[in-house]
């Protein structure tokens, strides 16, 4: 590919993203249709063979939905059981009691930081969002006041803190120490989550006016109040089961011999889909039968909670299709090649590569994996003394500027019932704050070591 053609690819991609935003935000066109049309148009303009365009888009949608559809469905069922049984109400009461109503946003960032450790962002989100809705209602604040701190905690853990799967990929690539990375990540992650979560929420929420009618909120809150609520312990155990199982799966090769039957069993139950499935089945007993619901009621709950997730699932899949087009058209390769032209320190290179890949692909995990794979050989060759900081810098870059090609962007938009413009002002800025603050703290830490 000639340099001029490569630069034009970047121009085409930028125009496509701008067109996407304008058509959805300004002209109020259906987001799924717009993403599909823009993705196919970009592929054709970028020179992809017409016969391969639809296949590439379908592959991107299918790959994304193959995981996300199951996660959203199972997580929504688990959330519905928490809501109907009063488990979410019990957790909300306990959190408010311990932290106080004025500090509910601090409670949400703390629980997200803990629950999100072994979970991909989407899994943690669907697990915790019923609690966020319930806390917001009880305290009488906008869902954004507790929801933004929640997603800040989840995102910080996703980007920085092992044993989260995304962070572990970078730890392996850079040959970093898990223990030291964990220590540095906590030191950097806590202030980052505070700034991007509770503090930013206090600033932006008064400036965002949400519609009063939120169909997704209704399915968690519009129910008859129950006299008897499940205990906090059993509710917490149910929601933490997938967390524990995924932690076990993440450490399977360290606590068992790779390849043997026990190791395979641990990897199986530690898979996010299996872990959520087991937790959902457990909730049918702990939050269903044990609370006086019969099988017909549980069937009704699980059926009615899925309909509102259809649009979310489609939008997340469409974002995956756009992601695949950007990769197959050569846009991501061009970004990597362009960044190679600048001779930067490994720390800056790790952040910059990850940031560019994040903007291009929409996936924090893909950005972290790709960037660490590119930068690690350079850093190792230069003998960079602190590979743990490279993990953190790469993780910080991987969450910058979430926009329309990121499934998480649409997940946040739909669940919190925001417009595209409001999602940029809240979620996109929050993610960018996490990236910049975490990177600044990482650079600062590098001068102290």
Regions found by a protein language model. Name each.
Residues 99-102, 346-449:
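C-terminal transmembrane helix pair
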Residues 69-75, 98-131, 313-319, 342-377, ...:
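Hydrophobic alpha-helical transmembrane segments of multi-pass integral membrane proteins
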Residues 33-36, 40, 56-89, 268-330:
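Core transmembrane alpha-helical segments of multi-pass membrane transporters/permeases
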Residues 72, 101-117, 139-159, 177-191, ...:
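Alpha-helical transmembrane segments of multi-pass membrane proteins
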Residues 2-7, 183-300:
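Long, contiguous bundles of hydrophobic transmembrane helices that form the permeation core
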Residues 134-243, 409-445:
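Membrane-core helix-loop-helix motifs of multi-pass transport proteins
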């Amino acid at each position: 590919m000639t340099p001029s053609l490569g630069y034009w690819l970047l121009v085409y991609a930028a125009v496509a993203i701008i067109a996407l935003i304008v058509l959805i935000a300004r002209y109020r066109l259906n987001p799924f249709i717009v993403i599909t049309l823009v993705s196919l148009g970009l592929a054709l303009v970028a020179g992809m063979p017409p016969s391969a365009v639809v296949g590439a888009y379908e592959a991107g949608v299918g790959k994304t939905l193959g995981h996300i559809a199951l996660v959203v469905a199972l997580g929504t069922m688990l959330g519905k059981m928490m809501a109907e049984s009063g488990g979410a109400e019990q957790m909300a009461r306990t959190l408010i009691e311990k932290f106080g109503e004025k500090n509910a946003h601090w409670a949400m960032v703390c629980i997200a930081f803990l629950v999100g450790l072994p979970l991909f962002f989407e899994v943690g989100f669907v697990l915790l969002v019923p609690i966020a809705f319930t806390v917001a209602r009880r305290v009488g604040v906008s869902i954004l006041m507790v929801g933004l701190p929640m997603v800040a905690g989840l995102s910080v853990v996703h980007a920085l803190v092992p044993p989260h799967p995304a962070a572990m990929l970078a730890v392996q690539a850079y040959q970093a120490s898990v223990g030291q990375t964990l220590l540095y990540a906590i030191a950097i992650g806590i202030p980052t989550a505070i700034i991007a979560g509770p503090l930013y929420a206090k600033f932006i929420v008064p400036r965002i006016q949400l519609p009063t009618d939120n169909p997704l909120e209704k399915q968690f809150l519009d129910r008859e109040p129950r006299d008897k609520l499940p205990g906090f312990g059993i509710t917490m155990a149910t929601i933490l089961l997938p967390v524990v199982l995924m932690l076990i799966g993440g450490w399977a090769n360290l606590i068992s011999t790779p390849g043997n039957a026990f190791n395979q069993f641990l990897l199986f139950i530690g898979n996010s889909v299996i872990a959520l499935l087991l937790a959902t089945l457990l909730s049918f007993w702990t939050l269903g039968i044990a609370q006086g619901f019969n099988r017909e009621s549980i069937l009704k709950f699980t059926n009615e909670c899925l309909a509102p997730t259809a649009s979310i699932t489609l939008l997340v899949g469409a974002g995956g299709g756009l992601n695949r087009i950007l990769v197959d058209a050569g846009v991501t390769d061009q970004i990597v090649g362009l960044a190679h032209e600048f001779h930067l320190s490994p720390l800056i290179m790790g952040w910059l590569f990850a940031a560019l890949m994040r903007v291009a692909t929409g996936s924090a995990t893909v950005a972290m994996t790709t960037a660490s794979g590119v930068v690690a050989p350079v850093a190792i060759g230069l003998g960079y003394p602190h590979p743990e900081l490279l993990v953190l810098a790469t993780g910080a870059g991987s969450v910058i500027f979430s926009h329309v090609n990121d499934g998480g962007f649409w997940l946040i938009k739909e669940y919190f019932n925001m417009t595209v413009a409001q999602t940029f002002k809240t979620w996109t800025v929050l993610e960018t704050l996490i990236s910049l603050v975490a990177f600044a703290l990482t650079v600062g830490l590098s001068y102290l070591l």
